[in-house]
């Protein structure tokens, strides 16, 4: 006997083939009523249990909950004082800044971001960006509104340069005017006058510029201060060309003062300036002399220009020089002979003798037997040649030029005691040399 199973829903029917004709059937061994075979039978080979069907919706819900938890668990963005904007705009080149509370417009030009101003509404900032984009990039630039809205503005902007047009846009912004004035950097003081001040200068919050009777004067004072600080790129209330004459005049005055100060610094000596120096004072002083004094000074220069007090160490008896090492050093006979030849070759006359003494004084001092230091040699007296007359003037000029006292010159030149007439002439020459040096 064969049995046939029919599945209807979740109920399985078992019928014997012998009972098919009779129309009777059994369900799990129990007798059932007349059953009619359905036209279409759907069979499920691996039916899903109730427990598995309950697990599926729970896993889907868990996925959604986990994704939502991950989204909420992300760390919030760091907020700084001047950090990212709290709200972005739908317009191109417009940004809302929480710190200022305004919609600010910027445009990029040649790799630099140009500030166009702050506005109360996003639409006003977007229009400022559109005008700047048309000015910088032409009518084919990407703008927020249609090009027909700016037909009149295009005609006006052709008369301005880029810098001037940016200043015009900034003046139209809401952030340009502060306080109770319609000008930038100007406020009404409680005393009734208009106060001008400029902000963010040299690390200070603002710099006070003064009080003015009218609003226009205060605005001009602010413009001048802004131009001095920022140059041509400064944002001013009025056109910068109105201040060109005044700024050029101030720069010319400063250059003139600089030239005068440099001229007084003594780069080149002017005509008529005489330099006086003393052994005890190394400072240099410049004085102007009258024509009469210049003539007298020229005469003194011709007579005893090289006369000055002696700074060389005193020479003891015997023609020796005492150095700082407390040893006596004698010049060689060859050097003494050379110096005597120079003096004698200069001539027997008074003028030629003085010239030779001056040349001897200006020559470099060399040839000491020991050491290597260029100490001033003792005065080498001119030897008395037979048949030659003694010239007291030549001796006094040579002694004054050498820088040694007159007594030592007399001792070196003649062992005998000098006469009274020679002493008086020497005293007079020494007094004249001292007077010339004092001048």
Swiss-Prot record:
One of its GO terms (molecular function) is DNA-binding transcription factor activity. One of its GO terms (cellular component) is nucleus. Keywords: DNA-binding, Nucleus, Repeat, Transcription, Transcription regulation. Induction: Target of miR172 microRNA mediated cleavage, particularly during floral organ development. A motif (Nuclear localization signal) lies at residues 78-87. Residues 76-85 have a biased composition (Basic residues). Residues 90-146, 182-239 bind DNA. Residues 410-439 have a biased composition (Low complexity). It holds the Pfam family AP2. It is found in: Nucleus. Residues 67-88, 363-439 are annotated as: Disordered. GO terms for biological process: regulation of flower development; regulation of seed development. A motif (EAR) lies at residues 258-262. Probable transcription factor. Involved in spikelet transition. Prevents lemma and palea elongation as well as grain growth. May form homodimer. Belongs to the AP2/ERF transcription factor family. AP2 subfamily. This is APETALA2-like protein 4. It comes from Oryza sativa subsp. japonica. The lineage of its organism: Eukaryota, Viridiplantae, Streptophyta, Embryophyta, Tracheophyta.
